[in-house]
Curated annotation (Swiss-Prot):
Coiled coil segments of this chain: none
One BP term from GO: transcription initiation at RNA polymerase II promoter
TM annotation in the entry: none
Pfam families registered for this protein in UniProt: TFB6 (PF17110)
Record-level GO cellular component terms: nucleus; transcription factor TFIIH holo complex
Listed name of the protein: Uncharacterized protein C1494.09c
Cross-referenced PANTHER family: ADR380WP, TFIIH COMPLEX SUBUNIT
Length: 157
């Protein structure tokens, strides 16, 4: 039986996740300055709890919430990658976590066609951004090709 969150709990959860993204976004805006991020690793560390909480939300009753926060988080992370020097290990670590989260969403069978298309498009865009970002770094070509591989292979259209 899936855990059913009350309206109050859902509001607190939304506020908590919004607050994490807001805090990370504000520190990102100050990157390379005091109080801001100096490296992608720092941003990824602060963003990890966001994705851990999103991945723990029961999908059976809250697919819309999980989908929305997953899409927002992925979109935010891929936008921030370009603002830092290439950091392959951190990039692939985060995308491995995101691939698992997306795969869970896809395999739930609860995604609408529209959300599936949005998710697929975002995952493909992420691949292109990472390939472009790491084009000057040797030895990561196969890793770039594997970003969201499990999730993209699970989409049936």
């Amino acid at each position: 039986m899936a855990l059913e969150l009350t309206e109050h709990q859902l509001n607190k959860l939304r506020d908590f996740l919004d607050e994490i993204l807001l805090d990370v976004s504000q520190k990102y805006q100050k990157k390379f300055h005091p109080g801001g991020y100096q490296k992608l690793e720092e941003l990824a560390f602060d963003l990890e709890p966001y994705f851990q909480v999103v991945s723990s939300i029961p999908l059976e009753k809250h697919t819309f919430l999980v989908t929305n926060f997953t899409l927002r988080g992925i979109d935010f992370f891929v936008d921030t990658i370009v603002g830092f020097p290439a950091s392959p290990e951190t990039t692939f670590k985060v995308f491995s976590l995101l691939d698992s989260l997306c795969l869970r969403l896809i395999q739930s069978g609860n995604l609408s066609t529209t959300d599936t298309i949005r998710l697929k498009s975002l995952m493909e865009n992420c691949r292109m951004v990472v390939i472009s970002k790491l084009s000057d770094v040797q030895g990561y070509e196969m890793d770039c090709a594997s970003i969201f591989e499990k999730s993209l292979n699970s989409i049936d259209f």
